[in-house]
Amino acid sequence: MKKFVTSIPNLLLTFTLCFVLSSCSSTGVKMSESSPWETIQFEDQSNALDIDFIDNNHGFLVGSNRLIMESNDGGKSWEKRSLDIAAEENFRLLDIDFKGSEGWLIGQPSLVMHTIDEGKNWTRLSLGKLPGQPFLVSTVDDGVAELATTSAAIYTTSNSGETWEAKVSDPSEQGGIRDLRRTSNGDYVSVSSLGNFFSTLESGSDTWIAHQRASSKRVQGIGFNPDGNLWMLSRGAEIRFNDDSNDLESWTKPIVPILNGYNYLDMGWDPEGNIWAGGGNGTLIVSKDDGKTWDSDPVASNLPTNFIKIQFLEKDELDAKKGFILGERGYILRWNG
């Protein structure tokens, strides 16, 4: 009798797990036979946080601890550079963006720099008392840029940063943000700092619109796919897609390709339309059938790093997309597909 009673909790747990798994799409993951990525390891153990290229060969990478590196061979090799800022100021360089020879660089705390000569010289600009810290910068046109902060405030400049004008009238309802993306046409999407909701801002609008998360799981990240629809990464290694940009409350069932105790931190689409998702402890998976099945990447799985950002760069100045995956502790991957 005692044995029967103690088995009841186990049965309940089994039924609960069956119910939970039935509400998800668990695909299973096998290891790919080959990889389109090559590993680059820097001596500097700082974390790479963003990368951009001016043309096919010339680009910059920025990261924590004032890290800035330059490549002149398409990202195959990198050389460390320095910025003209006081040695005692330790900045976390978050974002860099170029359009032609003009570029913008932002960091925390309160750093904005501007170049008009492909990064040979950088000018530090005064921000004044903006709400929040710089989070994302976008080069729009000659002398024109948009700056988003950690409080979801967005500012624009049309005179190379001499003055900034508020684009969002009142971001106070947003609170802080943990993720924020912008499309080339000026649409934004963000995730609240706690991951309990996400918000959208259409180009030309001055008001964020808040949306409920797709489930009780907190949102890790959100972004746009090549068609302009949204994807969502949630706690518990869940992946979701929104197929209708007119209904942002409608999401696919959660896809859970692999349960290894690590969440996915970013997603990206390669030039062939394959979907890549990266996360903790060398987790990097790819789907070649729109998320139905997934494979694990053999190069990434052997690296002692967390993959925090997946970038496929596409702009007029580039003959073809460039791909990089940024990891922690001096690791990045370069696309060779």
UniProtKB/Swiss-Prot annotation:
Part of early PSII assembly complexes which includes D1 (psbA) and PsbI; not found in mature PSII. Binds to the lumenal side of PSII complexes. Interacts with YidC. A 7-bladed beta-propeller torus, about 55 by 55 Angstroms, with a depth of about 25 Angstroms and a central pore. A lipid is attached at C24 (N-palmitoyl cysteine). Its main location: membrane. The lineage of its organism: Bacteria, Bacillati, Cyanobacteriota, Cyanophyceae, Synechococcales. It is found in: Cellular thylakoid membrane. It comes from the Bacteria. This is Photosystem II assembly lipoprotein Ycf48. InterPro entries: PSII_CF48-like_dom, WD40/YVTN_repeat-like_dom_sf, Ycf48/Hcf136. The keyword Nucleus does not apply. The gene is ycf48. A factor required for optimal assembly of photosystem II (PSII), acting in the early stages of PSII assembly. Also plays a role in replacement of photodamaged D1 (psbA). Assists YidC in synthesis of chlorophyll-binding proteins. The keyword Signal applies. A lipid is attached at C24 (S-diacylglycerol cysteine). GO terms for cellular component: photosystem II; plasma membrane-derived thylakoid membrane; thylakoid lumen. SUPFAM superfamilies: Oligoxyloglucan reducing end-specific cellobiohydrolase (SSF110296). Gene3D superfamilies: YVTN repeat-like/Quinoprotein amine dehydrogenase. Keywords: Lipoprotein, Membrane, Palmitate, Photosynthesis, Photosystem II, Signal, Thylakoid. Residues 1-23 form the signal peptide. Belongs to the Ycf48 family. GO terms for biological process: photosynthesis. It is a lipid-anchor.
